[in-house]
A protein has these predicted regions:
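Divalent metal-binding pocket/active-site signature
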Residues: 194-255, 383
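Active-site neighborhoods of metal-dependent hydrolases
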Residues: 190-213, 220, 266-406
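Acidic, glycine-enriched loop/beta-strand segments at the rims
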Residues: 34-47, 59-61, 360, 391, ...
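C-terminal motif of bacterial Sec signal peptides marking the signal peptidase cleavage site
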Residues: 18-19
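Active-site mouth loops of central-metabolism enzymes
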Residues: 100-113, 169-189, 238
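Divalent metal-dependent hydrolysis catalytic cores, especially in the metallo-beta-lactamase
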Residues: 112-141, 148-157, 200-210, 237-238, ...
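Metal-associated gating/positioning segment near the N- to mid-region
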Residues: 77-145, 164, 244, 248-255
Length: 477
């Protein structure tokens, strides 16, 4: 037993932790610089005591604790809240699509490996909370894997069987994956009541009448949308709208939704200059939450690049067998599907560049709101499509990079991933800052992310409900 205890202690010391032999439900983090939205500047080295997974004490003075308490010597490192990705889909496998549907259902072992690694990959990139606006049924499988981010979810209301997103499925069982359908016997009020009873924290609707310039899919009319909104507010549930086109934004704003679940990248307009600035000004004036989701268009373009999965960062977070499947062309079916919309002799690199125009438009829209001082929400929409390029955690980090490229400041990025989503979704009492009484989902970094987004690459330790996790231990095995 003595040898075992010595080995455990040696391992802990290796990444700044020390502990005695008796069990404790406390963790003491000493000599850290706290970086949190409620603090205008980072104070001198502080000490933080965590008890039962919650921050119990913060002090500039040494905190007296029993010898049994595990300790982390911060050595002047930076302690921040964990990130929240406000748009992540746990039930979709990159390169395959929805779990339980072809091709995912034909690769059970690969899907199982992905589901086991997915929460660890998110933690690897500092994501300790996620919101899934459309979790289907596999959210239960995600929640069963530990360790993993705290999962919050919306109840999604599809536009009937002929509308989006059900019309994108060709499987007979797909309708059963959408339990919150409005029918002749289930009113909007009944559906929202069930969403609330099932523990969701928001309601999602789809304002999508067709991709690109298409506009043939049915939408709910203003009367139904108003009833959904009123029912959601009666249950204190924010109303999210899937929308990415100017005309769909207009409907969303007229319906007085609370959050736009995508950035504005579709600028299709019948004639004349599209009223992009006017629409974005309405977003700002109405105080609507904004999820830029730059990675949707970026991931589509990158999926067309033949060597996309050779980038070294994928090996850290993608199970080896799944990565081999990607590299062997397993996900090329989706690249071929994307390429079918282009001239057959066009190089794939040129096709990818065309998707880059959409990225540029959504970055310009995000820049408009940043300049207006509008609070943003960090939201990657991983994977956003069957693209293999958008992998859990890495997708969030790349979204941060794209926000910075759009001109979003490190401070705004920091708030977009911490305090803003906590406020938007009624979680501020438990998440979003480093304060007494908050859930101890924290990150220990080598640099200050409020000054430079590169600091997000310096995560040393992830603390999940008071449990310290060495970052390297979260890599794909």
């Amino acid at each position: 037993m003595a040898v075992k205890v010595w080995l455990i202690t040696a391992i802990l010391v290796g990444f700044g932790l020390t502990a005695c032999t008796s069990e404790s439900n406390e963790l003491l983090i000493e000599n850290v610089v706290i970086v949190s939205a409620e603090r205008e500047t980072a104070p001198d080295a502080m000490n933080v005591l965590i008890r039962d997974g919650v921050i119990a004490e913060i002090s500039a003075e040494p905190i007296q604790a029993d010898r049994s308490v595990m300790r982390i010597e911060g050595d002047g490192r930076f302690l921040t809240p964990g990130l929240m990705d406000s748009h992540h889909h746990v039930a979709f496998v990159p390169g395959m699509g929805a779990i339980g549907v072809a091709p995912a259902r034909d690769h059970e072992a690969l899907v199982d490996a992905y589901m086991a690694q997915q929460p660890r990959s998110l933690l690897y990139y500092g994501v300790t909370q996620i919101l899934d606006p459309a979790p289907l049924l596999a959210w239960r499988d995600f929640a069963a894997n530990s360790p993993g981010p705290d999962l919050f979810r919306c109840g999604e209301i599809p536009n009937g069987e002929a509308g989006y997103p059900i019309n994108q499925r060709d499987d007979a069982d797909m309708v059963s994956l959408y339990p919150y359908r409005i029918t002749s016997t289930r009113t909007p009020e009944m559906v929202v009541e069930r969403i609330a009873a099932d523990g969701a924290i928001c309601v999602k609707i789809y304002l999508e009448d067709g991709f690109g310039a298409e506009s043939e899919w049915p939408l709910y009319d203003a009367e139904i949308l108003g009833r959904i909104r009123d029912a959601a507010r009666a249950h204190e549930l924010p109303l999210l709208a899937h929308a990415n086109a100017i005309d769909m934004y207009q409907i969303a704003l007229d319906a007085d939704v609370d959050v736009l679940a995508h950035g504005l990248w579709n600028w299709q307009w019948p004639e004349g200059d599209p009223p992009v600035a006017e629409i974005l000004q309405r977003v700002h004036e109405q105080g609507v939450g904004y999820m830029p989701t730059h990675r949707v268009m970026a991931g589509l373009g990158e999926h067309l690049l033949p060597a996309r999965m050779d980038a070294p960062e994928y090996a850290d977070i993608v199970p080896a067998d799944l990565l081999d499947w990607y590299r062997a062309g397993g996900a090329d079916w989706f690249a071929d599907e994307l390429a079918a919309d282009f001239p057959p002799d066009m190089p794939r690199e040129e096709m990818a560049a065309i998707f880059g125009y959409g990225v540029g438009r959504v970055q310009r829209a995000t820049a408009f709101l940043e300049q207006a001082g509008h609070p943003l929400l960090l939201a990657s929409d991983c994977p956003g499509s069957p693209t293999s390029a958008n992998q859990p955690g890495l997708c969030t980090r790349l979204e941060i990079e794209s926000l910075a490229q759009a001109g979003v400041s490190p401070e705004s990025v920091f708030r977009a991933g911490t305090i803003n989503p906590a406020r938007q979704f009624g979680l501020e009492a438990r998440y979003g800052t480093v304060e007494v009484g908050k859930v101890a989902n924290l990150l220990l970094l080598e640099a200050n992310p409020r000054l430079d987004i590169a600091a997000w690459d310096t995560i040393q330790t992830v603390i999940l409900h008071g449990e310290p996790l060495a970052r390297d231990d979260l890599k794909a095995r």
